Amino acid sequence: VVSVQAQNQKEMKGSNIKAQELVLTQEWDKTFPQSNKVNHRKVTFVNRYGITLAADLYEPKDAKGALAAIAVSGPFGAVKEQSSGLYAQTMAEQGFLTIAFDPSFTGESGGEPRRVASPDINTEDFQAAIDFLSTQPNVDPERIGIIGICGWGGLALNAAAIDTRIKATVASTMYNMNRVN
């Protein structure tokens, strides 16, 4: 178990928000086999609400130059060790640098109360993931996309509608739960 400090705190400078330090396991803890085609490591970043998010970063082995990147989250109630991690690892095998993240209030990420959803905060989680990816030296900030699975598909669409840095969006979902009254 390794303590990981939030790596993207630019927006927090000058604010009264203190990032939560998360303790993340560095062992392979996924529900799917580890690929021998990608490197994996745990990372954290902070959203504008001061919540520290836990993520798994997947990078193609022997990658050269600035890569296109993808942030993946969902489905609702799931964690990055499940389907979003599998999506991220599979996309990394195809040449993308990817992160699968636990949204606020879920899994290894911070936030109280636990196991709740907030469309505003969870949309911001995607934007915080873009902040993190765009600061990585091996990422082309002009080629960043997002994938929202199931209930997070609608949140991915929300994020893409308000954040012009997102150049591609996949909503792998049967409906947009954000439009339900």
Model-predicted regions and their roles:
Residues 153-164:
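Short glycine-enriched nucleophile-adjacent loop
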